[in-house]
Amino acid sequence: MAPKAEKKPAEKKPVEEKSKAEKAPAEKKPKAGKKLPKEAGAGGDKKKKMKKKSVETYKIYIFKVLKQVHPDIGISSKAMGIMNSFINDIFEKLASESSKLARYNKKPTITSREIQTAVRLVLPGELAKHAVSEGTKAVTKFTSS
């Protein structure tokens, strides 16, 4: 019985499609044509302003630091993109490392101590020392003001 049941719907569908196509192509197509433009027109009346997706970058800060260090040197947009990607990568590494440190110590909060330890672990040698001193200076300036 299963093969018969499978054959019957297959036979009926083409017959129904043919009968629908033969009986009312002139009637149904204009109605559908009329409905679609009205719906599209109604959607067109409610024009919503497309907001430009804001992308946060470090480009302005990179440029400011560049001008502090070398005022006469510029940077290409491709190099700026690379620097922005580099900073995002470093911050992501620092965040994950400080998160691990907080978890190891069973603390719910990432403090400046976890960040400082993460900097020492992620950055190599002399760079870590300079980063820690600059970070300490920035935190002191922030808390004093």
From Swiss-Prot:
One of its GO terms (molecular function) is protein heterodimerization activity. The modification N-methylalanine is found at residue 2. Keywords: Acetylation, Chromosome, DNA-binding, Isopeptide bond, Methylation, Nucleosome core, Nucleus, Ubl conjugation. The keyword Acetylation applies. Residues 1-53 are annotated as: Disordered. Can be acetylated to form H2BK6ac, H2BK11ac, H2BK22ac, H2BK27ac H2BK33ac and H2BK34ac. Mono-, di- or trimethylated at the N-terminus to form H2BA1me1/2/3. H2BA1me2 and H2BA1me3 may be methylated and/or acetylated to form H2BA1me2K3me1, H2BA1me2K3me1K6ac, H2BA1me2K6ac H2BA1me3K6ac, H2BA1me3K6acK11ac and H2BA1me2K3me1K6acK11ac. The modification N6-methyllysine is found at residue 4. It is found in: Nucleus; Chromosome. The modification N,N,N-trimethylalanine is found at residue 2. GO terms for cellular component: cytosol; nucleosome; nucleus; plasmodesma. Transmembrane segments: none annotated. This is Histone H2B.7. It comes from Arabidopsis thaliana. The lineage of its organism: Eukaryota, Viridiplantae, Streptophyta, Embryophyta, Tracheophyta.
